[in-house]
Amino acid sequence: MIVFPFLLFQMLSTEVEGGLFDFNATLPLMALQFIILTTILNFIFYKPVTNVLDERDEYIRNSLTTASASLVKADELTKTYEQQLAESRKKAQDIIKVAQEQAQQIVSVKIKDAQAYGEKLVSEAFHQLSIQKEDALKTLEMQVDTLSDLIKSKLLND
């Protein structure tokens, strides 16, 4: 029987409810509950999450800044070392060129000395041969003289 008085009360009531757009005390209460819930969720969940995300973003930015600074420094060092390497190669090539020129000069001096020594030996040998030739001619002339004297004496004695 409790249902009957309730239904009767409903029928006698002249007030029509607005349904979804009923502007009574529940709407501001629901709005207040939503704002309070949003504020509580903001402090409990969203603030720590945003703090973590901000810290992560700052860490990533710092890491990127450090990495780009390191990359710039590495590029500078690479350029410096490549320049030093190029200079060292050029110096090494210059040293090799100078050493080759010096070696060529030493070789040419040695060749000239060897040629001079060879010419000296040839000259001395020629001189020795000339002396021996003259000695041989003198000896031969003396032998010819003695033989001719001998022949002459044999011819005259006979």
UniProtKB/Swiss-Prot annotation:
Annotated InterPro entries: ATP_synth_b (IPR034679), ATP_synth_B-like_membr_sf (IPR028987), ATP_synth_b/b'su_bac/chlpt (IPR002146), ATP_synthase_B_chain (IPR050059)
Alphabetized Pfam families for the sequence: ATP-synt_B (PF00430)
Subcellular location: Plastid, Chloroplast thylakoid membrane
GO cellular component, one term: chloroplast thylakoid membrane
UniProt keyword terms in alphabetical order: ATP synthesis, CF(0), Chloroplast, Hydrogen ion transport, Ion transport, Membrane, Plastid, Thylakoid, Transmembrane, Transmembrane helix, Transport
KW 4Fe-4S (keyword) present: no
Topological relation to the membrane, as annotated: Single-pass membrane protein
Subunit relationships: F-type ATPases have 2 components, F(1) - the catalytic core - and F(0) - the membrane proton channel. F(1) has five subunits: alpha(3), beta(3), gamma(1), delta(1), epsilon(1). F(0) has four main subunits: a(1), b(1), b'(1) and c(10-14). The alpha and beta chains form an alternating ring which encloses part of the gamma chain. F(1) is attached to F(0) by a central stalk formed by the gamma and epsilon chains, while a peripheral stalk is formed by the delta, b and b' chains.
Note: In plastids the F-type ATPase is also known as CF(1)CF(0).
Assigned protein family: Belongs to the ATPase B chain family.
PANTHER family cross-referenced by the UniProt entry: ATP SYNTHASE SUBUNIT B', CHLOROPLASTIC
Listed name of the protein: ATP synthase subunit b', chloroplastic
Upper classification of the organism: Eukaryota, Rhodophyta, Florideophyceae, Rhodymeniophycidae, Gracilariales
Gene field: atpF2
